[in-house]
Amino acid sequence: EYRLAELDFKEVTKMGYSLFEGGYKQLFKEENEQCPEMIFSIQCYEQDGYGHQMSFKYGSRVTYPGGWNDFYGDTDFIDTYERKDGKPFNWDDYIPGYSKMSAKARSVYFLRDGLNSGNGNFGSGNYRSLKTKMQDYGADFSKYLDQGNEERIRKVYEDRDPRLIQTYITPYSEYIGSPYTAGGLEYTYTLRWPFIENDIEAP
């Protein structure tokens, strides 16, 4: 009954819907929970009985005390986020030849700094052994920047529609987390790969 469905949706457009113009981040503030952009809005209340267990699973394990899992965004969907200037996103505009490389070869662009020199930003792990593992995996180290690999890939995400980094934890971005061992204290985390260890000054 596509014709009837179309008529129903047309009725929805007459119910006062309009775009929210206060900024994407503000859209999720309490005072805007039932703004005209919301359709079938469900309001959130800070009281027992109005939550759900999925809240414990958002983000990474260190984002919230008691987090049980990690959720990952689909990379094809993330690539649909446009550039800041409104142009369609294309990896080759930032890293020429990226799309012609195999997935394993181009994984080199996502690696942390210091794998050649051992002079990384963080941790005391064996950087050289991590490099060997990634070479065996198939990462093309001829494209690697020992100091600057992190910055190069971070800029790819920062030059996008700002809703991207407001929705996802992107490579080498920082975010606030509070592991269950911290007693409610907040720490700043950076998403790096390969993981080595936590800083001894933070959980």
Feature locations, PLM:
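Active-site beta-strand/loop architecture of penicillin-binding DD-peptidases
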Residues: 184-203
